Amino acid sequence: MLDTIKIIRAKLSQVADSQGLPLYDEREVRALADLLLEEVCGITRTNRLLHPERILTAEERARLSSIVARMEQGVPVQQALGYAWFYGMRFEVSPDVLVPRPETAELVDWIVTDLRSRPTSSSDVSSPVSKPLTICDIGTGSGCIAISLARCFEDARVLAIDVSSAALNIARRNACQQNVDNLHFAQIDVLEYVDNLDSNIGNTPQNNSFPQGYQHLDIIVSNPPYICQNEAAEMSEIVLEHEPEVALFVPDDDPLLFYRSIARLGQKHLKKGGFLYFEINAAFGEATCQLLGQMGYRNVELRRDIAGRDRMVKALYS
């Protein structure tokens, strides 16, 4: 029986190391074990260091055993827990949504920094800030981007859209959990919506249209599908088996599919002086910038993440 902190920490490390995550080095595996002990049992790092032989209670053992059993089946630790931390908040996750990742928090940081550094009113077309600020998060998933921005800008109006009703249900619960009420959700297929625009269809179907009050946007942000199908062989089986394929992959012959469609949507719905913010595939940073320039966007900026990879793009609509 795994009764002590020291022994169960070793077991958790063994499980994490064996479940197909070669990206985890020994330090990260230890951190994962420590995370579970803190999240599941409330045992802080200080307590672990001071009392490594402390006997876990029967309830603690049962809860940890359940988590470990799911991890042994290849379930990501966040899904085994049922939640992930993002931007200081706890978000429900499931196989219906992507697990929020640190590089996405960097994208949110960029937007927050930009908006807080600009005046609240300006005649300068380069400033998108108006009152109230109107933001749209396309492909919201768990809602981590939209909810974080809604919390940072409580007087803003934020629209979170996704093609998946299951994802939207999770995002709604997360918004409720965080007491965010300046957020509206809509089920919209962006690719279909843009196809209708480009086909000159007079009326977009009612169930696939932007709601009233969100027709003119200051900010569009998106972390859309951007992994080519031929990259799947290089990915962890844990991601492939437990995160939604629809949120991950694009055709090999059209890797910028969603960026082109969202940029086209921006041409219709962004205010003059509004901005696009994207998370991108590091392999297509320059190509994404070129695409936006060709579509009439200005001041296109490519930014690297903390790991030094091209990961984010910002562009001005004018």
What are these regions (language model features)?
Residues M1-A84:
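N-terminal auxiliary segments of SAM/dcSAM-dependent transferases
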Residues I43-T44, H51, P76, L81, ...:
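Residue-level signal for pocket-adjacent positions within structured domains
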Residues H51-P52, S65-E154, V158-R173, Q187, ...:
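SAM-dependent Rossmann-like transferase core, predominantly class I methyltransferases
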Residues I5, A33-D34, L64, V77, ...:
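A general structural signal for well-ordered alpha-helical segments in protein cores
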Residues L35, R63-S66, E106, W110, ...:
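Alpha-helical elements of Rossmann-like donor-binding domains used by nucleotide-donor carbohydrate transfer enzymes
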Residues L2, T57-R61, L98-P102, D252-L256, ...:
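Short, solvent-exposed loop/helix junctions and linker helices
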Residues C152-R157, I161-Y317:
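S-adenosylmethionine
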Residues S18-L23, D114-V129, D195-Y214, L270:
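Alpha-helix termini
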